């Protein structure tokens, strides 16, 4: 299986620290571990604190599959992530 780096850019409806606390929660870390997904970077746009970049690395298609999982979508949205604002790019 190829290693893939996935870049998510999206808007949030809560302060970044609040969103990051959910992303860094034990539950989310466990979900990522089970899928062999590693967070390489997360941050906010310099001039727009509602714009987030998240860079993850894992097996090909793993990050996108988790993001698109209907069971995970409510967790994503409950963190303040505006789901429909998400742009995804993948790199090998």
Where are these regions (language model features)?
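Short S/T/G/P-rich N-terminal loop/turn motif that feeds into the first structured element of a domain
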Residues: 1-74, 82-92
